[in-house]
Amino acid sequence: MSDQNPSSFVRTRIRRFSEIDNAYGEHYQFRSRVPFKSFDDRIQESRLIFSGTISPIGGYSRRHHNHEATTVYRSLCLRGFVVQGSLDPRNRGLEDVFRVIDDIGWSYTVLHVNPFCPRVVREFISNIPFYEDGALIRGFFYRFSPSVINQLMMKPTVEHSFQWKDVVLNQAITHLTGGQCAGWTGFNLNALLDPFQILYCVCERSWLPGPDSDLMMRKRLRLMYAVTKCKQIDFGQLVYEQVIDMTRVRDLETSLIFPNLIYQLLVLQKEAPLLPGDEDPIGKGIPIYDSGSDGSGPRGRRRLC
């Protein structure tokens, strides 16, 4: 790549993202930290790897570990979902954002964000507290751990995860706003530089989803700073901790997070059996647009997309 001029470099990057799910994959030469594969290819490879780890536990009709799990499931039916965000790799306006995400190997957190079966996701959440490193899903034990998340999301191995929660907030804000703001006082999300406004939308839906409290906003800014500085972060641990914390929340007003990712992790291991009464899949990834697009949505203190 060293002999490429800048214009050809841009064309190469745009092409490699636009060809992820097309037929040209074997022809492009760009070396990425993460090999780009179609979702079908990912399914075939991962199911082959996990074929010997999915243990049967009863029949398809066994949806809950015990009565307590059944009770939890019923309460989960009263709660909605935070559908994750997706980026269109063909959108040239997202070039800078894709580069940042690809540099840390998190490309698949914004790609292949497919619809999910609500009942299966709720069953997973209700059952996971009763098993170590996995959950019962309709008569089978599916694995769920930080290492499994990283493996299935094709996240590069991280030996020592950067402690992003310790990032100095003022330093993060100064960097992400290009010096327009020096700290939390007077800070507004619209002060973020354009690529970082898009990155914030990714963060609030796909990395640190949840209520838009000041505490959560600060956490997102710290994580974004670490990401833009190409710090190595254990994505699997990041997601795992949030999912486990979610299983302890009983507030019916709190939406369930990571539904697309949870369902994807299950499907990548083994097709979840469908049962009578299952709804059609819902919640295809919400498109996140570049800042110049008409679809970028309302802007304000707390919402960017």
Model-predicted regions and their roles:
Residues 2-300:
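A structural signal for long, well-ordered, hydrophobic/aromatic- and basic-residue-enriched core segments
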